[in-house]
Regions:
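Hydrophobic alpha-helical bundle cores within soluble ligand-binding/oligomerization subdomains
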Residues: 2-189, 197-451
Length: 451
């Protein structure tokens, strides 16, 4: 734990030392005695959290409007941070993580559990009815990924998750993972009741992790029109899409990790609202998928694909871009000047897009492969940046990946959704642990009821 003196804490908060002491007396901050002296010290993380809360309060203004419009945070989370143009998962640089990690490793970080728990999925590995799944899949194989997932998840998840509940590991198996999971430590001197409670805690935690790992695989298989597998998600998608080059398979891995979470976006807020009601986890994930489908969220990749198609047919790229800018300027959301460009949270450019596009360029250069599709994609990005000063977002990068690798239509959306399921699960688990019902209020602006 990093420690601060009273002067250091006051400076970080931008207040006087007497005001700092007032915060302590009001319970907003805690001080701790230094055993070597009479001085008190402060936990740096706690001070920084209070500083962020004060900053949020100062800029709250008309909270009812701004909290729902890229404004003041509406709830607290320890999962993902977006600040100063950087994206972090539980304090780790998500961009650096994506260069080497699998989605399962990112999920283990987001879910705060050992990697082995994410990889386990006992239902998929031991008792999954593949023939029954294929029968359902045949009915939906020709439908878009989202429709297929929304149909198959409710049909298969309840049976799968009841099976995981019967296969929860024993307390003896779970005990070595106490620290990694952040579970309450076992007290050797605890009485029998406390021991039984701890055992129940472990079992509930294990059941939730089995449920989460199973849902990750069911969602992936439904989106990709494949059979659920314990293989890493990027390899499952590569097999479904017949991607064989190891460099290209690596690009799928990078994309999934970059999409794993992005703080409190519309789909994640939907997931948290559903989870707060006590609904089943698969219900929260299904709600997230429905929200993700919107053209201003995960469905943005489909609009980018249409933009790329038009650019490929255009005789004059600059005139095409100007016409598209004029067309999108008529949309209700003035920020949506062109799909796939300019992210409000990244004024200097979306780092996720930068990494994925650079990795795509490097993968093709490594095998000296010419790609008219990539050349056209990069030309469009340059033309838009020249016209608007806007840089590509992750939606554009995913569409570029789909187009360059000749993946099936909708693959960009599938990558976005399959990766984001890991983050949704993390948020659902965090919301369940919080135990509060999310119930915002609306400010009525209609006609008053006549007296």
């Amino acid at each position: 734990m990093s420690r601060l003196s009273a002067n250091e804490a006051a400076q970080l908060l931008g207040v006087s030392v007497p005001t700092l002491y007032a915060y302590v007396s009001r319970g907003l901050l805690h001080s701790r005695a230094d055993g070597a002296s009479k001085r008190r010290y402060y936990d740096a993380d706690e001070v920084r959290l209070l500083a962020r809360r004060r900053a949020d309060a100062k800029r709250a203004g008309n909270v009812a409007e701004r909290t729902l419009d890229w404004g003041v945070p509406v709830l607290e989370s320890r999962i993902t941070q977006i600040a100063d143009g950087k994206l972090s998962y539980r304090g780790r640089d998500a961009i650096a993580l994506a260069t080497a990690a699998t989605l399962e490793e990112a999920a283990a970080l987001l879910w705060e559990c050992p990697l082995a728990r994410v990889q386990a999925a006992p239902f998929v590995a031991q008792s999954f009815d593949a023939a029954r799944w294929r029968g359902w899949l045949d009915l939906w194989r020709d439908r878009p990924p989202l429709e297929r997932a929304l149909a198959l998840l409710p049909a298969t998840a309840p049976a799968a998750l009841s099976e995981t509940a019967r296969s929860v590991p024993s307390i003896a198996d779970a005990a070595p993972f106490d620290a990694a999971r952040g579970l309450p430590a076992r007290d050797a001197d605890a009485d029998a009741d406390a021991d039984a409670d701890a055992d129940a805690d472990f079992r509930r935690r294990d059941a939730r992790l089995d449920e989460a790992a199973t849902l990750l695989r069911l969602a992936t298989a439904a989106l990709a029109a494949s059979t659920p597998s314990a293989e890493p998600v990027h390899r499952q998608l590569a097999a479904a899409w017949r991607v064989n080059d190891p460099r290209d398979v690596g690009l799928l891995r990078i994309a999934l990790v970059l999409c794993a979470d992005h703080e409190l976006n519309p789909s994640t807020f939907t997931v948290r609202c559903i989870a707060s009601t006590g609904a089943p986890l698969f219900g929260a994930i299904a709600g997230g998928l429905a929200a993700l489908s919107g053209p201003r969220h995960g469905g943005e990749t489909l609009r980018v694909a249409a933009l790329l198609d038009g650019a490929a047919r255009a005789r004059d790229l600059d005139r095409y871009v100007a016409a598209q800018i004029a067309s999108y300027a008529l949309e209700p959301d003035a920020r949506t000047r062109l799909p796939g460009f300019g992210h409000p949270l990244y004024p200097g450019g979306d780092p996720r897009a930068t990494l994925l596009i650079d990795a795509l360029i490097d993968a093709l250069a490594a095998r000296s492969a010419a790609s008219p599709a990539l050349d056209g994609t990069l030309a469009l990005a340059e033309a838009v940046q020249a016209a608007l000063g806007e840089k590509p977002t992750i939606d554009f990068a995913l569409a570029a990946l789909e187009r360059t690798l000749a993946l099936p239509a909708g693959a960009a959306f599938t990558l976005f959704a399959a990766g984001r399921v890991a983050g949704w699960i993390a948020h659902a688990l965090e919301q369940r642990a919080d135990g509060k019902l999310i119930r915002p209020r609306a400010r009525y602006v209609g006609v008053d009821h006549a007296a």
